[in-house]
Swiss-Prot record:
Sites of Phosphoserine modification: 94
Annotated spans, Disordered: 97-127
SUBUNIT field: Homodimer and heterodimer. Forms antiparallel homodimers and heterodimers with MRAP2. Interacts with MC1R, MC2R, MC3R, MC4R and MC5R.
GO cellular component, one term: endoplasmic reticulum membrane
Gene: Mrap
Record's keyword terms, sorted: Cell membrane, Endoplasmic reticulum, Membrane, Phosphoprotein, Transmembrane, Transmembrane helix
Protein name: Melanocortin-2 receptor accessory protein
Organism the protein comes from: Mus musculus (Mouse)
């Protein structure tokens, strides 16, 4: 009760529940927006939210921690900064592969000399 000391005063506040209220019947043919367009709008908003979430997570993964950014590790071929510069990245990668064609072969030869398991497997013998 609102006033616990005086029991003679009636309580005048009411609680309304959705179960007790009769909702207004709606005829779907009289709606200004088609029911299919409402569903399409909901799906588009969900897809927009998912794309936005993906872009936020992608941006967060690009930024990295301050310790990773200032570490003395060698710079990768494509340093993905806050701006997306794909043509420059592809051009750098193609220049590095065309300038040093013998370097990779030397690395493969070094691997085969170091461990016999790194060599290419031969044909399998059938029983």
């Amino acid at each position: 009760m609102a006033n616990g000391t005086d029991a003679s005063v009636p309580l005048t506040s009411y609680e309304y529940y959705l179960d007790y209220i009769d909702l207004i019947p709606v005829d779907e043919k009289k709606l200004k927006a088609n029911k299919h367009s409402i569903v399409i709008a909901l799906w588009l908003s969900l897809a927009t939210f998912v794309v936005l979430l993906f872009l936020i997570l992608l941006y967060m993964s690009w930024s990295g921690s301050p310790q990773m950014r200032h570490s003395p590790q060698p710079q990768p071929i494509c340093s993905w900064t806050h701006s997306f510069n794909l043509p420059l990245c592809l051009r750098r990668a193609s220049l590095q592969t065309t300038e040093e064609p013998g370097r990779r072969a030397g690395t493969d030869q070094w691997l085969t000399q170091q461990s016999p398991s790194a060599s290419a497997p031969g044909p399998l013998a059938l029983p």
